[in-house]
Each structure stands twice: as C-alpha cells, then as structure tokens.
Amino acid sequence: MGYKSILVHLDTSDRAHARLELALRLARRFDAHLTALSAIYTPEPVSFYVMAGSADYFREQRERRDERVAALERLFHAETTRAKVSADWIAADARANTVVPRHARHADLVIVGQSDPNDPETYIDDQFPENLVLSAGRPVLFVPYAGDHASLGERVLVAWDGSREAVRAAHDAMPFIEHAKRTTVVAVGNGNDPDANVRIPGADAALMLARHASDVNVLDIECGPGASIGDTLLSRAYETGTDLLVMGAYGHARWRELVMGGVTRTVLASMTLPVLMSH
C-alpha cells in the first residue's frame, strides 16, 4: 500500500523550496507521480483602484509575483528531473479555496504548508487550511514553516478518540504506519466526552494497526487542569520524538470549532511537526 499520486501546493513563501524537497523525498519513497499546484493569494484589482496610483502598485505586485512563480516552476522541473520523479506543474486559474480542493481530489496525498504569521506570502485564501481539509476528501499533510523533517514517518503518533474522523485518518496514514519504526496510539481524555462509552477504545485501534505495522503501542492520558487536548497532543509528540502526528479533523461541527477553537485549530496554529489530517 502506498501513495501513487502526490499533490504539493507551492506558493511564493520562503518555505516553498523546503516543502518541495519533502514532497520529492516522499515521491521517491512511494514511487509516486508528483504534481505541483501553484496557487497564491492575489487581491482583487478593484480594491486597489480607490486611491490614486494604486493601480500601478497592483500591477507591479502582480508582475513581481509572476516572476517568483516562474522561477519556482523552473526550480520544480529542474529538481524533479534531477530526482527522476514523474511530475507535472499546474498553475491555478482561480482562487485557492476553489482550485486546490478540486485538484486534491485526484491525489492520494496532499501536501501544504502551515501559515506563518511572520510571512504574508503563506496567506493563500480565507481559512485555506480548514477549507482544504474539509472539502478535499483526501488526507492532507500539513508541513510546519520551520524544520526539514527528514525522518518523517519513522515515529508516528495517532491521535485517537474512536470517532469516524480518527478512523479515517488512521487508515489514510497507513502507507506511513506500515513502514514506521514505532507507532503510538494516544487517547487523550478530558472527562467531558458524552459519547466516550460508544467510541472504539484505543487498545482496539492499536490491535488493528498492529496487523499492518511491526511496533504499535497504546497510551491513554488525561488533560491536565486548564490544558487543551490539542496542546496535550503536541506536547506528547515532542516528548516522544514523534515525527508525524495523525489525526481526524473537525470531529465537532465546524462552526463550533471555528468560533470556539478546538483541537484542529490548535494543532494547525501551534504544530512543530508534520501533521496528517483527514475529515
């Protein structure tokens, strides 16, 4: 089992090259076809026409970004040729929230970057990460804006709550889990889950995964006072040297998580390791 078609989203941020390198490593590992999708945020021109000289500013910004995209395309073709990876390049013809999910549905795995508050080029579209993971129907691998993550997939942490989303994520991550040196199923409790008695226990999930992987263990932990499940997961991942976190996304109603926060948003904002999410 493996990913035979990988889609990587590339933008004009400083981390685009590192994301491409990671995608190339995975394409070689799984003998997969690699598609790069260039999609960047471009403001509507009408928003610039309210002030004198703003139209010229918009034109200059667009030309500068077009130059960076062209350079990125040349780099992509050079790197895939060097790595002998089957590849193609797609330039988005619409807003990212429309075009990226559409192309993602043709892939086995989608790779995108984490938003960096210090790099405006990582802003792609309104709530882009949330929209993608909810609408793509494919596993999305979010890559942090720091680090090279060379060991990705050797030590996997599966966040488990017995939900449909958790089951989907675990199975979507199976190509990683099958070759991992260690897989840990971690169930984080906070004592406030009304459906806990009907969810699949972590031990049962570990037993299922053990039929695919060589070293699987299970860990049940409780959130400390005032701690969130998302922060607890990230802390445990750091403490155990995990290099891939696998989790279901938006198990609660999306409006509730977007308004009140939640595990998904906490992890997307604070992650320091790659995170594979499925909905």
Tell what function each PLM region has.
Residues R19, A96, D125, A166-A169, ...:
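Amphipathic coiled-coil/heptad-repeat helices and related helical stalk/stem segments
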